Amino acid sequence: MCIRDSAITDHGLSHYMFGIKRSNLPVLRARIDKLNEEYNEKGLKILMGVEANLLDFNGTVDLDADIMDYLDIVLMGFHYGIKTNNFIEQMKLSLLPQISKPFKKWHEKITERVTDSYIKAIEKYPINIITHPGDKIDVNVVRLAKACKEHGVALEINSSHKNLSVEDLIKIKDIDVDLYVGSDAHKLERVGDVKEALRRANEAQIDIKRIKNIYVE
């Protein structure tokens, strides 16, 4: 069993600390193209992507046509520390899921609104994978998985974050949505470290063939 494809997916432009600079997009594209010349014949494909940021309840994502021209793959997730032109709407998405937690019915409504925002995003943008769904802000993972299956979008099992959790995977086990494992490596030595993601998939008894970036001989 091995990783078949590897994607380099820096955070989207809106992230304060880790967001890729627009000026670096052509530089990264050129480097990845050169690496593929060397490694494609060895069976490894390197993709250039970005982990775009969900910005508000309307499903707005920090992607535009200029960015898309450089990309092979688009990931999208929710993150804190985002700069946006609509600060109030971004803060609603960041804060309401947290402050509603002590109030069950209200939190359930907010969770459905969060789920709606993800679904709106995959309807508006050419997103391939949703990263760590349910991390930081809760989602209805069953509704999200069904929508992702309908739109050909995959979900990530993230080795560095708790989601998708074993419980999440059990809930969506019978929904034939594609899955990917990700290391979320912010350090060089952690690139490709997906042991925790695979452990969760195994515990939830997920068919390994559903994990699209794992090759089983």
Each predicted region: which residue ranges?
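Active-site metal-binding loops of divalent metal-dependent hydrolases
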Residues: 10-12, 51-52, 78-79, 133, ...
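Short, small-residue-biased leader/transition segments that mark boundaries at the very start
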Residues: 1-3
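His/Asp/Glu-enriched short active-site or ligand-binding loop at hydrolase and phosphoryl-transfer sites
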Residues: 152-163
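Histidine/acidic-residue-rich catalytic or RNA/ligand-binding cores of hydrolases
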Residues: 18-19, 139-145, 163-175, 189-202
